[in-house]
């Protein structure tokens, strides 16, 4: 995924989030938020499974974002997940994803990807949960976000240096990333919006089956 494509992907997703095309639903597990959005391109079959499970099969898509997590994010949350199936053919991310306000920040912790590994302005590295992540920032100007369709905001990224193996239980200790970001002057906002473990794709095909807790 080229950088301009990723920016389009993020902006388009955020625009539709701002008009509530994402739905939240209670589940039996600790998750309480179900995210399911597509721009209508291609075929995206998403299933909100029991507890923290979801699955998605996609073919020749435009942009889509599917995931499960929490209505209110937290800098102290430890996210556990098992991607029993993670098989993108083209552009896609397996990522912790969310937003804060005051200030408005969009953040990613990317554990795996398809054909494109995201980058930005390099800030350093952080070691967490058995891997090393590169830290990047990017800035969006007059772009869609959860607060409207013409906003300026910063994106924070932790991107694993190598794709994380899937098929077994995995952990993202989010506080490690928050603290590392803070050490580089990358402060998150004080008002936490949703936080999900997402499958995100753009102009690709594939399948995933993820359980989050």
Swiss-Prot record:
Organism: Bacillus subtilis (strain 168)
SUPFAM superfamilies (alphabetical): Concanavalin A-like lectins/glucanases
Enzyme class label: hydrolase
PROSITE patterns in alphabetical order: GH11_1, GH11_2, GH11_3
Protein name: Endo-1,4-beta-xylanase A
UniProt xrefs under Pfam families: Glyco_hydro_11
BP terms from Gene Ontology: xylan catabolic process
Matching Gene3D superfamilies: 2.60.120.180
Residue ranges of every copy of the GH11 domain listed in the record: 29-213
Family membership noted in the UniProt record: Belongs to the glycosyl hydrolase 11 (cellulase G) family.
Catalytic activity: Endohydrolysis of (1->4)-beta-D-xylosidic linkages in xylans
Signal peptide stretch: 1-28
One term of GO molecular function: endo-1,4-beta-xylanase activity
Enzyme Commission code(s) on record: 3.2.1.8
Pathway: Glycan degradation; xylan degradation
Residues the record marks as active site: 106, 200
Keywords on record: Carbohydrate metabolism, Glycosidase, Hydrolase, Polysaccharide degradation, Signal, Xylan degradation
